[in-house]
């Protein structure tokens, strides 16, 4: 399997410092998180393109800037975030972008459906024109967004992706917290095209736990080869990241 690191963990650093920290740890692949940009709506995507090229890193995926719309008046802002993220994905030469549902879990169903249609009615055609695949992430129970389990994801996908073209970004941390790991894998295992890897609360795995082993075995059964993207809490130390990297490299030799 292919190992990658979300550079969102170094979002407080400059872009050059961010990429340097990733390289210092020995990673070759990253998921570029739009949180790494000081202002997520910044349109200067060529700065990111230049910094990535200078680093020599490969950008396998990009995590979109996110706004969980809680009122229809915010739809235009969510669309803007999505389109700027897609522009950045194109500049970084990645063909896969992770997205959230972009709607608040507090919205009534009728308004939620309306907002979903309006947001993705703009984002999906733009992504298609750029040759970028969208991948919907399962959310945590603490998230303000809608889409934490199969029932909610099915509602979202039924509105925005009836053709079944979008992928799934499987966030193991979120699935463990919502106790939806098996249900999500059973439903979406063949659509997974990115995995956000972390233990509960986005803490690093320190060993191959029974839950992790079971997940990887089942994922391997779907012939998934990566990326496995380490997405870790911001206070994870460089030493802890290095140990987690070594752990997964050891585990991957078995698959």
Task: Give residue spans per PLM region.
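Active-site-proximal loop/turn and secondary-structure-junction residues that shape catalytic pockets
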Residues: 9-11, 34-36, 65-68, 101-105, ...
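Histidine-acidic metal/acid-base catalytic patches
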Residues: 1-7, 11-26, 93-95, 147-255
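A generic structural signal for short
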Residues: 6-7, 36-38, 73-74, 111-112, ...
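Catalytic-core regions built around general acid/base machinery
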Residues: 44-55, 119-126, 156, 184-187, ...
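N-terminal pre-domain/capping segments
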Residues: 1-94, 190, 249-255
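Glycine/Thr-rich phosphate-binding loops of Rossmann-like dinucleotide-binding domains
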Residues: 40, 107, 144, 205, ...
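Active-site acidic/histidine proton-transfer and metal-coordination neighborhood
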Residues: 54, 71-167
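Hydrophobic residues within beta-strands of alpha/beta enzymes
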Residues: 30, 60-62, 97, 134, ...
